[in-house]
């Protein structure tokens, strides 16, 4: 028994120390019996912050938010059995978004697998469709090889925590009873750092010269790290190229004349220009209309993404580069004789007129977009916005026009689950206001517990149209009218004031845009600001804006 305890202690203390060595500073633990050894090891480590969350699904998304906010890998830990399965949505989001989430699932020892033992399911390779690396660790014993396996596996897995290969990894860790390590053996807990991998690349620009010397070019930038924007702006300025900037690109925070923000509304309203080449940077953009245009254009398409698994959506490019945006555009700098002034001015003219139409529209509108426009106005430069999927991110795409705020969202799998938890995780490291719809909010109300338990301050702006507003824009509304409200509208009739009381949030309800205009978003307390809207009215008012922009484009071109 003594040998078992010593071996278990050495294994879990070494594992915790190795995670620290590769940059982990936070671990989110969902309580359970089988995870006792590692939970105690993390709690005992002097330089690792532990968070406790009883809901594994929300806990995993909270960790995703911590990673987004800290830009470091974060680990999650749960007990054996179905607890682990609840991690799946957040792991899928992390895989598509290249988020270094370290998944630690505790397991029964090998002799208790597949024999009907309680709280035992097959956890080996259970996330193999969504993780970049996975390993079933050996059980603790007295051998040197068991400890060596930790060093070997962490070194292999570290390539997925940084650089172009980033993504979630999974370690399954079986433990035998008794489960308590020796908490007095703290000399085994170390805080030494490893040399982290560094990636640097350049390209031979000569292969692109004949393409880039053409006149009508566009730079389209999707979700990417804010450190990557400098050279995009420099290149655009030197070579007079318009930048169509997604709200998650971190480019709309710059008041730069080449940054085009209204493109989704312009394409939605009938814009169709001939283009010679497109440089696509980062993740795919949110705008459905821009993605549809990319699928049909004859323009030569160059894709630049700083990861090893290229996301080619909406269409495979003519050429792609695995390289950072800064390195790519730095490699392209050279003298050129191409005069693109008239091409750039055409886009700048459309942008200016588009903004004017949006401003006029918002002065009269009473729909959800008017609420969103007011929220953007009220958000200070010290704060960031976390935007839920479905309609909120689309309204922000259309209405965020060069304001110095950062915008974040879960745009990997684009699901509505885990939004509250992800935003709260980010709120640990940044001042965050969450914009979310009522169905997405309902889906992750459990996540609010972390604010209550840990005094995490975050304001929530809740657009409540009592259902799924985005479906009003889809063909189902016209083709399935008899069944639409029950199958797609999905009204719940929930009173979220009780949710606020349950989790100790302040609560304010607004029935009109004029009421919300006079409100102040407080930074000292956590408040839910519920904005009551109407789905049908929201749809009709959006159509008015599209028509106005269509007329403007027709008159301009």
Curated annotation (Swiss-Prot):
Give the E.C. number(s).
2.2.1.9
Q: Which cofactor does it need?
A: Mg(2+); Mn(2+); thiamine diphosphate
Keywords on record: Magnesium, Manganese, Menaquinone biosynthesis, Metal-binding, Thiamine pyrophosphate, Transferase
Describe how the cofactor binds: Binds 1 thiamine pyrophosphate per subunit.
Tell me the enzyme class. transferase
UniProt cross-references to Pfam families, sorted A to Z: TPP_enzyme_C, TPP_enzyme_M_2, TPP_enzyme_N
Report the pathway entry. Answer: Quinol/quinone metabolism; 1,4-dihydroxy-2-naphthoate biosynthesis; 1,4-dihydroxy-2-naphthoate from chorismate: step 2/7; Quinol/quinone metabolism; menaquinone biosynthesis
Biological-process GO terms, alphabetical: menaquinone biosynthetic process
The record's listing under CDD domains reads:
TPP_PYR_MenD, TPP_SHCHC_synthase
Q: Which reaction does it catalyse?
A: isochorismate + 2-oxoglutarate + H(+) = 5-enolpyruvoyl-6-hydroxy-2-succinyl-cyclohex-3-ene-1-carboxylate + CO2
Could you tell me one molecular function GO term of this UniProt entry? manganese ion binding
Check the record and name the HAMAP family matching this protein: MenD
Q: Which family does it belong to?
A: Belongs to the TPP enzyme family. MenD subfamily.
Q: Which NCBIfam families match?
A: menD
- Describe the protein's quaternary organization and the partners it interacts with: Homodimer.
| Matches recorded under PANTHER family | 2-SUCCINYL-5-ENOLPYRUVYL-6-HYDROXY-3-CYCLOHEXENE-1-CARBOXYLATE SYNTHASE (PTHR42916), PROTEIN PHYLLO, CHLOROPLASTIC (PTHR42916:SF1)
Main function:
Catalyzes the thiamine diphosphate-dependent decarboxylation of 2-oxoglutarate and the subsequent addition of the resulting succinic semialdehyde-thiamine pyrophosphate anion to isochorismate to yield 2-succinyl-5-enolpyruvyl-6-hydroxy-3-cyclohexene-1-carboxylate (SEPHCHC).
Q: What is this protein called?
A: 2-succinyl-5-enolpyruvyl-6-hydroxy-3-cyclohexene-1-carboxylate synthase
Gene encoding it?
menD
């Amino acid at each position: 028994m003594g040998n078992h305890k010593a071996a278990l202690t050495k294994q879990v203390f070494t594992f915790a120390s190795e995670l620290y060595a590769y940059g982990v500073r936070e671990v989110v633990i969902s309580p359970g019996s089988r995870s006792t050894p590692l939970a105690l090891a993390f709690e005992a480590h002097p330089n690792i912050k532990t968070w406790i969350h009883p809901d594994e699904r929300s806990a995993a998304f909270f960790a995703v938010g911590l990673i987004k906010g800290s830009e470091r890998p974060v680990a999650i830990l749960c007990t054996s059995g179905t607890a682990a399965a609840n991690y799946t949505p957040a792991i899928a989001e992390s895989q598509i978004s290249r988020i270094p989430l370290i998944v630690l699932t505790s397991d029964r020892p090998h002799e208790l697998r597949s024999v009907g033992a309680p709280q035992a399911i097959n956890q080996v390779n259970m996330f193999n469709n969504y993780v970049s690396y996975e390993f079933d660790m050996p059980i603790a014993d007295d051998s040197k090889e068991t400890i060596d396996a930790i060093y070997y596996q962490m070194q292999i897995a570290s390539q997925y925590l940084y650089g172009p290969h980033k993504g979630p990894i999974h370690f399954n860790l079986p433990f035998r009873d008794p489960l308590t390590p020796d908490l007095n053996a703290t000399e085994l807990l170390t805080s030494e750092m490893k040399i982290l991998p560094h990636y640097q690349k350049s390209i031979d620009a000569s292969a692109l010269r004949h393409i880039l010397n053409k006149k009508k070019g566009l730079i389209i930038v999707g979700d990417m790290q804010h450190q990557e924007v400098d050279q995009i702006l420099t290149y655009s300025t030197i070579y007079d190229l318009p930048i169509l900037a997604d709200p998650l690109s971190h480019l709309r925070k710059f008041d730069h004349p080449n940054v085009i923000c209204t493109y989704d509304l312009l394409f939605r309203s009938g814009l169709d220009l001939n283009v010679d080449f497109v440089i696509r940077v980062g993740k795919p953009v949110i705008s459905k209309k821009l993605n549809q245009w990319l699928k049909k254009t004859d323009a030569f398409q160059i894709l630049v993404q700083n990861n090893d698994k290229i996301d080619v959506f909406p269409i495979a490019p003519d050429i792609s580069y695995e390289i950072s945006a800064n390195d790519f555009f730095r490699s392209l700098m050279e003298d050129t004789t191409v005069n693109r002034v008239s091409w750039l001015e055409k886009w700048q003219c459309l942008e200016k007129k588009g903004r004017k139409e949006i401003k006029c529209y918002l002065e009269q509108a009473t729909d959800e977009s008017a609420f969103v426009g007011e929220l953007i106005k009220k958000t200070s430069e010290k704060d960031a916005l976390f935007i839920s999927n479905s309609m909120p991110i689309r309204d922000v795409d259309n209405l965020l026009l060069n304001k110095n705020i950062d915008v974040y969202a879960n745009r990997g799998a684009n699901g509505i689950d885990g939004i509250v938890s992800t935003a709260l995780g980010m709120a640990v490291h940044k001042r965050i206001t969450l914009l979310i719809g009522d169905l997405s909010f309902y889906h992750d109300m459990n996540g609010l517990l972390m604010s209550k338990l840990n005094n995490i301050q975050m304001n929530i702006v809740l657009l409540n149209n009592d259902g799924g507003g985005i479906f009003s824009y889809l063909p189902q509304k016209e083709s399935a009218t008899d069944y639409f409200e029950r199958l797609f509208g999905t009204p719940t009739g929930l009173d979220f004031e009780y949710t606020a009381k349950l989790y100790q949030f302040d609560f304010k309800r607004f029935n009109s845009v004029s009421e919300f205009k006079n409100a102040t978003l407080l930074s000292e307390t956590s408040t839910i600001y519920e904005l009551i809207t109407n789905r049908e009215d929201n749809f009709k008012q959006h159509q008015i804006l599209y028509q106005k922009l269509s007329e403007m484009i027709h008159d301009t071109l």
